[in-house]
Amino acid sequence: MKVERLGWLGLRTDRFPETVEFFERTLGARVARRDPHRVMFELGNGDPIDVWDGEAPENTHFGAAPVVGFAVDDVDRARQELERAGVELIGPVQRGSGFAWAHFRGPDGNLYELQQREPTT
């Protein structure tokens, strides 16, 4: 596996409204999508940041630390490599909104993500 770049950053907060306002107004991040428990931002260069409400039922596996997503060319193959290396995997590969991703826990106990942009047809 070769990590190509940082591909995503996600964080969960108990101060959801304040954090969303901070990213939008103070940092000037563009809102790409707004859901009841998540706001997806894009930075000026297109880098994605998801801010999740701490009360959201989704992503309860997120801890207090931000989750960094590593972009790879083949998420299925990369996940298999992690499995062979004995890395703790969190669920199967998931797909949606043009991406495939898989979570894993690093030796530091933090959650990380492998992510791949899916080909468009």
Predicted regions and their residues:
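Short secondary-structure junctions
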Residues: 28-34, 88-93
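Short, conserved charged micro-motifs
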Residues: 18, 75-79
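Short hydrophobic/aromatic beta-strand element in the GNAT-like acyltransferase core
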Residues: 40, 48, 69, 101-102
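Conserved short beta-strand elements that form part of the metal-binding/catalytic scaffold
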Residues: 30-63, 111-117
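Exposed loop/turn and edge beta-strand positions of beta-sandwich/beta-sheet ligand-binding modules
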Residues: 5, 35, 64, 98
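Vicinal oxygen chelate
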Residues: 1-2, 79, 83-121
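Conserved active-site alpha-helix within GNAT-family acetyltransferase domains
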Residues: 17-26, 102, 111
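N-terminal beta-strand motif that seeds the catalytic metal site of vicinal oxygen chelate
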Residues: 1-20, 65-68, 118-121
